[in-house]
Design a protein with these regions (language model features):
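Catalytic-core regions of glycoside hydrolase
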Residues: 1-48
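Catalytic domains of carbohydrate-active enzymes that cleave complex glycans
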Residues: 32-33, 47-151
Length: 151
């Protein structure tokens, strides 16, 4: 919940999708070695329809699951949530940050990352800014690898 009046990243359906992407920028800032999410398919009742009743413990919508049963969508197998796809984008952002660091651009990376998220309680909630910074990271990677333009 809120800590001393500060917000942090909440990972439920009801919150902006950036909440699933930006923790990886903080992971870079704090040089954390990994991230563990407690469950991706936790349904407290096996007969419950998570498509129409998404609450975990009757209050946290989408908490504990990133995959849904595909049967309701006519798919034989699991369906990935949009939250999971945004989480993947965050992991890809972290890969860009780490690659640039390995290419000798730590100062550039640190400066760019600080523009997005400098702590668990302070981040930029403008999605456009995230895309612009990611494009700048991609361009710098291409330059360092001797390629002319990022695609």
């Amino acid at each position: 919940q809120k800590v001393g009046g500060l917000s942090t990243f909440f990972w439920q359906i009801d919150f902006p999708s950036l909440n699933f992407r930006l923790p990886f920028w903080v992971i870079w800032e704090d040089q954390i070695q990994g991230m563990l999410y407690w469950s991706t398919v936790h349904w407290s009742d096996p007969v419950r329809d998570v498509w129409t009743d998404p609450a975990f413990r009757n209050r946290y919508n989408g908490e504990g699951y990133f995959f849904y049963p595909g049967t309701e969508a006519g798919i034989a197998g699991p369906v990935a949530s949009i939250r999971l796809k945004v989480l993947r984008e965050g992991i890809e952002d972290l890969a860009y940050l780490k690659l640039l660091d390995q290419l000798g651009e730590r100062e550039f990376v640190t400066t760019q990352a600080a523009k997005i998220a400098s702590s668990w309680w302070k981040w930029n909630d403008d999605p456009q800014q995230v895309y612009l910074i990611r494009a700048a990271l991609a361009q710098k990677i291409m330059e360092k690898q001797g390629k002319s333009e990022a695609t």
